């Protein structure tokens, strides 16, 4: 069977945690492989630090974006779909696009799939996927999601999504970021105020206040941020900060890539990119 000249390049930040890689990035890639058997699938990671760690520690070599583009040239690929597993179209995604487009003269076409959160429909799908996954939590428990955050203006999406959880019927779900806003301190204050406002609506409903938080990463992979900044046992971790504020804290180390509905969104974004070529 002749090799296809069409390829899908799946670009991820990467992770040094093997279990997290298998549970998220590889499952996304495998779902794309299954959905588009007529395409050859390539992988690239963008974190130089993680690539270096894997090479030195595990003797695992994963190409960066430029290396993957050069490999596709060598393999005779002419049509490229690039699907990032980034959450937002922020700085990391823009750098990736620039690197890819520096090779545009070597291919007949290059089309980009959108990051995970790229519109209202995506946002609503994500809200329901997470809301349904954690619907077992009782009324005294809040789900606190840790996003990465970015200095890019696109960071406003985190606050918008936090509000969308409430608007779509998930008042106990809160979204913050580790490197931008909303910060963990802002979330602690918001959750504290939630208990006060809930009680003020009904003076007999003292049981509406939040007593416990379940922490989970709003990141594709449950990597270093999730293990250390979120669930770590040091005083500045989110788990410790919530415990110091008087809440019981439980951490779930499961990245968004482990959720089927999230992976389905990436497959949908690949299909949209393919459709854009034919239009």
Describe the role of every protein-language-model region.
Residues 1-279:
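Active-site-proximal alpha-helix that buttresses catalytic centers in soluble enzyme cores
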């Amino acid at each position: 069977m002749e090799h296809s000249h069409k390829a899908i390049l799946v670009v991820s930040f990467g992770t040094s945690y093997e279990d997290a890689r298998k549970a998220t990035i590889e499952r996304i890639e495998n779902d794309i492989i299954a959905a588009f058997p007529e395409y050859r699938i390539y992988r690239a990671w963008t974190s130089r630090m993680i690539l270096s760690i894997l090479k030195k520690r595990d003797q695992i070599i994963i190409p960066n974006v430029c290396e993957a583009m050069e490999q596709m040239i060598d393999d005779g690929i002419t049509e490229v779909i690039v699907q990032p597993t980034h959450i937002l179209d922020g700085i990391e995604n823009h750098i990736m696009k620039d690197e890819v487009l520096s090779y545009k003269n070597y291919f007949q076409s290059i089309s980009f799939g959108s990051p995970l959160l790229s519109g209202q429909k995506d946002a609503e799908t994500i809200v329901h996927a997470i809301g349904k996954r954690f619907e077992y939590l009782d009324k005294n428990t809040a789900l606190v999601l840790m996003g990465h955050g970015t200095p890019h203006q696109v960071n406003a999406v985190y606050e918008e999504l936090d509000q969308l959880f409430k608007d779509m019927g998930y008042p106990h779900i809160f979204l913050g970021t580790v490197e931008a806003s909303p910060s963990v301190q802002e979330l602690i204050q918001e959750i504290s105020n939630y208990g006060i406002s809930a009680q003020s609506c009904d003076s007999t409903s003292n049981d509406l206040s939040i007593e416990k938080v379940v922490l989970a990463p709003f990141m594709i992979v449950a990597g270093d941020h999730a293990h250390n900044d979120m669930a770590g046992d040091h005083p500045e971790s989110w788990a410790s900060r919530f415990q110091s504020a008087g809440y019981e804290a439980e951490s779930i180390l499961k990245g968004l890539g482990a959720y089927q509905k999230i992976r389905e969104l990436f497959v949908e974004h690949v299909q949209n990119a393919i459709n854009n070529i034919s239009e």
